[in-house]
UniProtKB/Swiss-Prot annotation:
One of its GO terms (cellular component) is membrane. It comes from the Eukaryota. It is found in: Membrane. The chain crosses the membrane at residues 74-94. It is a single-pass membrane protein. Residues 1-20 are annotated as: Disordered. It comes from Saccharomyces cerevisiae (strain ATCC 204508 / S288c). Keywords: Membrane, Transmembrane, Transmembrane helix. This is Putative uncharacterized protein YJL152W.
Length: 119
């Protein structure tokens, strides 16, 4: 390697080519370059853009013999860019519930970052 020979005169005299070794990376360096850790870091960054939408529904279903009330909680975790798709799916499910059940009352709570909205 000619470039090593050209730079050899700049090295301190106590270091020779035969004793020069590449140090092993420290655990901190390995942590940075680990593929799974990089993926986890990306997921943490994505987590800041997630909206947690909690649909709390109370379904009152009447039949000839009994009147029963059942509460359901459904948690949608959607990316902010796809919040419209999640709401469209919810509206379709809600309309299907209205078709087959007498009455559906629901509460929507949106958790996004530090804010909390309820409708």
């Amino acid at each position: 390697m000619p470039h090593l020979a050209a730079e050899a005169h700049t090295w301190p005299p106590h270091i020779s080519h035969s004793t020069l070794s590449i140090p092993h990376p420290t655990p901190e360096h390995r942590h940075v370059f680990h593929k799974k850790d990089v993926k986890n870091k990306r997921n943490e960054e994505k987590g800041n853009n997630l909206l947690y939408v909690l649909f709390r529904t109370t379904v009152i279903k009447s039949s000839f013999r009994s009147l029963s009330t059942a509460g359901r909680e459904l948690l949608f975790v959607v990316h902010q860019g796809h919040i419209g798709t999640g709401l469209i799916v919810f509206i379709i499910c809600w309309r299907l519930c209205l078709r087959f059940l007498c009455r559906v009352s629901f509460q929507v709570t949106v958790y996004g970052g530090r804010s909390r909205m309820s409708a």
